[in-house]
């Protein structure tokens, strides 16, 4: 199995955590598109948003997706990667896409527990629980339309990893 595996989902869904664990289990390299952009540009997400706006960030995000995609790699994408139909189509055509699904309350609790971990500028300026609920409601159908498989990411990371490995084994 030398496919590309993409992880999509909202902030705090576990894309990086599960993606790294899955890459280790498969002996694949792992890349997080947000970290890739930081390492290749020396700009944080917030820096790009301030200087280029969200449109500039989304453009860079799409470029990063295409640059890092190759056979036999696990890619954790930014939460908004699915906003572009081109990105959704690209991922579906070039690999297996897992949507890490979790209720807004779970995601908000994770963000509140680790306020500095991977934080991006607020999308709405509202309290985190409200923002997560609003963003998730707006993107849920996009995540599902991009995904080949939906994983319950509200459970422990080890359980999510087992779900992913079982699904990959079935499709091999």
Curated annotation (Swiss-Prot):
Cellular component GO terms held in the UniProt record: cytosol
Protein location: Cytoplasm
Pathway where it operates: Metabolic intermediate biosynthesis; chorismate biosynthesis; chorismate from D-erythrose 4-phosphate and phosphoenolpyruvate: step 5/7
InterPro entries linked to this entry: P-loop_NTPase, Shikimate/glucono_kinase, Shikimate_kinase/TSH1, Shikimate_kinase_CS
Record Pfam families: SKI
Binding site for ATP: 9-16
EC number, UniProt record: 2.7.1.71
Record field: catalytic activity: shikimate + ATP = 3-phosphoshikimate + ADP + H(+)
GO molecular function, one term: magnesium ion binding
Protein family per UniProt: Belongs to the shikimate kinase family.
Protein name: Shikimate kinase 2
Biological source species: Syntrophotalea carbinolica (strain DSM 2380 / NBRC 103641 / GraBd1)
Lineage of the organism: Bacteria, Pseudomonadati, Thermodesulfobacteriota, Desulfuromonadia, Desulfuromonadales
């Amino acid at each position: 199995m030398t496919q590309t595996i993409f992880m999509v989902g909202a902030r705090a869904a576990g894309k990086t955590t599960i993606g790294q664990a899955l890459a280790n289990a498969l002996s694949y390299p792992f890349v997080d598109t947000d970290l890739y952009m930081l390492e290749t540009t020396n700009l944080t997400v917030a820096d790009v948003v301030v200087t280029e706006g969200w449109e500039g960030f989304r453009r860079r995000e799409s470029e990063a997706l295409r640059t890092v995609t190759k056979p036999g790699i696990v890619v954790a994408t930014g939460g908004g990667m699915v906003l572009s139909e081109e990105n959704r189509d690209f991922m579906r055509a070039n690999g297996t896409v897992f949507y890490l699904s979790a209720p807004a309350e779970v995601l908000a609790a994770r963000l509140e527990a680790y306020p500095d971990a991977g934080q991006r500028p607020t999308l709405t300026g509202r309290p985190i629980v409200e923002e997560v609920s609003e963003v998730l409601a707006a993107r849920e159908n996009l995540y599902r339309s991009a995904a080949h498989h939906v994983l319950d990411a509200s459970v422990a990371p080890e359980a999510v990893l087992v779900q992913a490995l079982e699904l990959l084994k079935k499709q091999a």
